Amino acid sequence: MSAVLTSIEKTAVQLDEFRKTRLKDRPVDFDAYMAAREQDVALVKPAEDFHDALIEEFHGEEKARGLYLPWRKLDNLFRIRRGELTDWAGFNGHMKSTVVGYVLLELMRQGEKGCVISLEMKPRKTLRKMATQAVGTPQPSKDYIGRFLDSVAGKLYLYDQQGDVEPERVYAVITYCAEELGITQFVIDSLMKVVRDEDDYNGQKRFVGKLHSLARDLNVHIHLVTHSRKRENEEKRPGKQDNKGSGSIVDQVDNYAVVFKIPKKDDDPGPTHCIYLDKQRHGEWEGHIALWLHPSLQFHQDGLLRGECYV
């Protein structure tokens, strides 16, 4: 009996050593495997589960189909939808940031809460631009400055840091502001202050991909300001292929808009700027809208000569 047991024990030891060797050669994290498997299964749903969402897509409230931009011509062509990422591109000096600030003011008038992560401009300068846009004059009085701040109280937040910042910090700021402050609109100005090297294509791809995931998972809209490559002649507007850095930026964003300052003489009464929508993943329209810049930094679609006061 003892000899038989010894033989069995030897065999067991040999099998155990063989098993350990196999596991060492081909490590498997079963817990991670099962967790991922369960998650994937949970994400596979029958079409009928989306009944209410589909009804809302066609017949829901206007807000469910997106928020309006400041220009009524775009009401049924392009809207700002939660869960999406928009790239606002253009040449240096063509007022991309100013346009995005004007858009943010309109979104806040519709009940949204915004956070500006401007790594190129101090908060007081950002607020100066937005105050003139909200009041409709380039030099608002102290009373109107107070009225402007009252109108954005609890709606507008600014991240007070300039210069280069690590991507992880941007992710953390967005997540905190969305979950703890209820912020739904984020402006990041600009990409080059987060991913420093123009040829760091993998870094740009990872950053933009993560922003897209955050917009979707947190149900917010992220506005990312990027730069178009410099040209000797900037009289022709840039396109998607002119975006600085990785081509994956344009591939990953939901919407791609180009802000272009129209080259013209000072006495030309025509429009001063155009916004070209070159990509809209969840909409059919692509095209452009002509705008007139007012001294208050408002952008009008009809050549309006006077500024409008919104406070």
Predicted regions and their residues:
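Core recognition of P-loop NTPase motor domains used across DNA-transaction enzymes
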Residues: 1-82, 150-153, 214, 288, ...
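Conserved inter-motif catalytic segment of the P-loop NTP-binding fold
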Residues: 2-21, 28-31, 52, 65, ...
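C-terminal regions of RecA-like/P-loop NTPase motor modules
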Residues: 3-16, 27-33, 45-46, 171, ...
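The Walker A/P-loop phosphate-binding site
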Residues: 35-137
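Hydrophobic/aromatic beta-strand patches that form the interior of the parallel beta-sheet core
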Residues: 86-88, 115-117, 157-159, 223, ...
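Alpha-helical scaffold elements adjacent to nucleotide-binding pockets in ATP/GTP-utilizing enzyme cores
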Residues: 103, 125-130, 173, 210, ...
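Conserved H-loop
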Residues: 119-121, 220, 224-227
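Helical hairpin unit composed of two closely spaced alpha helices linked by a short loop
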Residues: 183-224
